[in-house]
């Protein structure tokens, strides 16, 4: 089962790497340049924001890779909110051949920052909600997110979320998530599967780890 605990590591990780907690003034508009990438929203607990989420530039942080080279169990990597820990768990469990997605994100140095990671399930969902590339109708069977700010207790409607207002992330934009394309989260669903989300209608599924879907690295800073 996904683990809903243990998201509070980013500040310490950034300090350990000699990076500042505040790389820029606090962001106010979805999609604005911030912290080596682009502001994607906030994540928190019980509606209280704890971190700003930052999506990396598409040209350097978006790629197609396998979650794992085999459909076997992973130690850890089951949190829905702690992408840094999930990524660290995979990096510790095997090399880049075993965990291509996690190592790709972990090894990035972009915008002067080296604390990029593979987003956990609820982090990836926030990216979809705020940076949806198309005007396609949404599925209504998923979308609730206890870690969104504000909390979303209900699933999507066909029209909410709408296409993002951030032009660079809309279809055809330089920073868009590939439309109607599957993106891996770092959250393990079972010993053989991991969770992924389709950046079209917002479908959420679990599937075999040894399939190459896209991954988009993110980072976060404390509010």
Regions found by a protein language model. Name each.
Residues 19-112, 116, 181, 193, ...:
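Extracellular adhesion/carbohydrate-recognition regions
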Residues 59, 123, 188, 219-221:
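Short, flexible loop/turn elements at secondary-structure junctions
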Residues 3-7, 68-71, 78, 82-83, ...:
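Compositionally biased, low-complexity segments enriched in small residues
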Residues 198-223:
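Disulfide-stabilized, aromatic/cysteine-rich ligand-recognition loop
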Residues 2-25:
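N-terminal low-complexity, intrinsically disordered "leader/linker" segments enriched in small/polar
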Residues 12-14, 19, 151, 169, ...:
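Compositionally biased non-globular segments, especially hydrophobic aliphatic-rich helices
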Residues 102-115, 121-198:
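An exposed tryptophan-centered "aromatic clamp" motif
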């Amino acid at each position: 089962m996904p683990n809903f605990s243990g998201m509070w590591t980013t500040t310490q990780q950034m300090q350990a790497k000699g990076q500042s907690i505040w790389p820029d003034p606090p962001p106010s508009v979805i999609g604005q340049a911030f912290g080596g990438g682009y502001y994607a929203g906030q994540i928190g607990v019980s509606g209280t924001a704890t971190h700003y989420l930052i999506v990396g530039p598409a040209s350097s942080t978006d790629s197609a890779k396998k979650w794992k080279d085999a459909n076997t169990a992973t130690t850890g990597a089951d949190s829905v909110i702690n992408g840094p820990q999930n990524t660290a768990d995979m990096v510790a469990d095997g090399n880049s051949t075993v965990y291509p997605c996690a190592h790709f994100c972990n090894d990035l140095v972009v915008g002067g920052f080296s604390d990029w990671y593979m987003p956990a399930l609820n982090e990836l969902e926030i990216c979809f909600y705020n940076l949806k590339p198309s005007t396609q109708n949404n599925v209504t069977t998923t979308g609730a997110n206890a870690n969104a700010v504000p909390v979303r207790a209900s699933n999507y409607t066909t029209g909410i979320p709408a296409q993002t207002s951030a032009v660079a992330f809309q279809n055809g934009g330089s920073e868009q998530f590939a439309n109607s394309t599957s993106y891996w989260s770092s959250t393990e669903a079972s010993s053989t599967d991991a969770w992924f989300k389709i950046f079209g209608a917002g479908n959420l599924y679990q599937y075999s780890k040894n399939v190459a879907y896209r991954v988009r690295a993110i980072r976060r800073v404390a509010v």
